[in-house]
Amino acid sequence: NQELQAFDETLREFLTEPDHFLTSLALVNHLQRTPVLAAQDLYAVEVEGKKVVPVFTSEQDLQSFKATQESAREQTWVERSSLDVLTQLVQAELFGLAFNLKEDGDVSNTTLFASSELIQFINYFTQTLNNLLGEENQKADSKDKIYLVPAFVHKREEDGQDDRLFATMSNAEGQSYVPVFTNLTSFAKWYGNETFGLPFRKAKGTILQWPLSEIYQPSTGENELDKVQG
């Protein structure tokens, strides 16, 4: 199953670099679209004192799990939507989803997601996609569009307001500009670039979702725009 394999690879990438913006988007896309291997009926096991529902992005990991868990062998394992399983476990007041549970071996795709945190994560990145790629934003004037804006955000101790510095780029004349993006393709090129995106990611930069007016006149906090041309 190529889709499940792609889901597995994305999960591994996310667990290696959980702050990676594009990997997070890809993971949410898989959670919404790619079925996982899960028990047909609600089935939970205890891990670290918490009741979790095991799901798998690897057939091999499922077989290994069944080999070590007698109760798992009694279940009928099928392809199911992660979101359906998540809804079910929330209703049953269980802790969360456990991906690719195993006792030893390659654990680079093994993790527990608390349901509350996972729902928040899915909602945030779904909203990001809707803000950026929704029909309303596509049709909006450039001054009204929502852009992806790379920035460094520091909270001031005295009043809790945000100070924001932007990941500026310079032209041959030495003039600085704030990079903003309306589509994921151009953003991905910048984000993956060794000169721009890599240092930004290492410095734990934040991706804001803003119209241009927020850059020049923010509704909260302060933006550092000295010597920036545009």
Give the ranges of each region predicted by the language model.
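An interfacial alpha-helical scaffold signature
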Residues: N1-G230
